[in-house]
Amino acid sequence: KVSDKNKNIKMNVQVDGKCGVKQAELNADYNTKAGLKGKIFRNPIMRGTWMFFALVDYFFQFHIKTLSFILAGKNIIFDRFYLDLFVDQGINFGFSPDRISKEIQKYRFLFPRMDNYVYIRVSPETCYKRKNDIPNMDYLNKRYEIYEFLAKGNKWITVDGEQPFEKVNSQIKKVVLD
């Protein structure tokens, strides 16, 4: 059901580049949740409690899944690793990219140190076209801004994700295997 906030959306027209009921529902759901999260996470006690439980959950899930590889001294390649937890929660909390970066630094001791960070830069518009479960462009724009800030501030290796898959794959392999 489309929320009242989006009641004027016509179901058979494109919404943010996608067509139909599904995208209208995703937008409505995002708007509803964003409003609720904004109210809940304004309270610093709620933010702290939420982040504590999210970190504990992520910490145990991560270590259960990777401990055997770490103990065996194997190389591990992660997709977003623990950083995405901080990016998502930072968006929920309304934090600036700088504040998110500081939160990552504060809790990095909980996770293994990475040898390299490879940032595959893809515009929000391209991401939106590639996936059909993205809530809306606002969400992608926020994530993009944060990852751009993190990549520049931490001197990550950046690969242009707008290129054909084979070229992106080749560049990542070169970075990781060299």
What is each PLM-predicted segment?
Residues 11, 120, 159:
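Hydrophobic residues at beta-strand termini and immediately following loops
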Residues 78-83, 101-103, 110-128:
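Conserved phosphate-donor/acceptor-positioning beta-strand/loop module used by diverse small-molecule
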Residues 94-102, 132-135:
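Short, surface-exposed loop/helix-turn segments at secondary-structure junctions
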Residues 75, 117, 156:
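Hydrophobic "anchor" residues on beta-strands that sit immediately upstream
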Residues 4-8, 12-94, 98-99:
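ATP-dependent small-molecule kinase phosphotransfer cores
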Residues 98-111, 140-152:
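PAPS-dependent sulfotransferase catalytic domain
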Residues 125-178:
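NTP-dependent small-molecule kinase module
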Residues 1:
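Glycine-rich phosphate-binding P-loop
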